[in-house]
Amino acid sequence: MAKTAIQTSQENQPVIQVENVSKLFRTPNEGAISALQSVSLNISHGEFITVVGPSGCGKSTLLKLIAGFSPPSSGRILCQNEEVRGLNTKVGYVPQESKLFPWLTVEENVGFGLDSKRYPREKREHQVQQFINLAGLAGFEKYYPAQLSGGMSKRASIIRALAYEPAVILMDEPFGPLDAQTRMVLQDELLKIWEQKRQTIVFVTHDLVEAVALADRVVVITHRPGQIKDIINVSMKRPRNIFEIHRQEGFDEAYGRLWNIFRHELNIGMH
């Protein structure tokens, strides 16, 4: 089906606009701590953005501001051209911990976010099953979180955020606690789901290989107070083979540039 002029115009508009945003935290002992300073960033419809930077640089803070968990101290954030004021219901949020509801089954957890959409029962069941199948969890619909492995819990947590199809998915180091092999499998599955659904993803990670492997663009944040140091365009073609990512044309160039920038920030943080 051909896209209308309105649809094309909407897709060309940034889905997220971060405009000169700063964030201060006040502590009893240290006074005001500047977590982010003068951050501006536009994120397009369907983009996969990864965010990297030294520990404590404000990566997670940026996600929480976009999610509306707390307001910026100055500047503003827009989601689909509307300023974020309070909880942003247009985004899905995947934290580092799976945080599935232990009293709900896999299919109930995945369908939880759909309740607010008031889907007819048949459509709701189809949507839940579609994402369960995409995540390789078919056959585990009736399992409870305590019966799942760490990797399976993470899959369920991710598709719970994806299933109600928010405009943007915010992912805060979702694969951090997992072993290397499970991480690669989940990276591959995430990319396959994203290729089909093309939801906008903003993905925080401390893993530079992961950052390059997944992203259209990598945003590098400086040591605190966090500012955008650079944005690296990743020219690797899609679809990508996570299991042979080091051999893919464009990987070495993007990774080398990212490492040089990141190494400089680490050196600054140590002085």
Label for each model-derived stretch:
Residues 111, 115, 122-140, 192:
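Conserved ABC ATPase "signature" region
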Residues 75-87:
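Conserved ABC transporter NBD signature motif
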Residues 11-15, 24-38:
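A short, flexible loop at the N-terminus of ABC-type nucleotide-binding domains that lies
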Residues 163-167:
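A short, proline-enriched helix->beta-strand linker immediately N-terminal to the Walker B motif
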Residues 52-54:
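The feature captures the beta-strand-to-loop junction immediately N-terminal to the Walker
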Residues 144-148, 152:
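Conserved ABC ATPase signature
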Residues 104-111:
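Short coil-to-helix segment of the ABC ATPase nucleotide-binding domain corresponding to the Q-loop/switch region
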Residues 67:
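Helix-to-loop junction immediately C-terminal to a conserved catalytic motif
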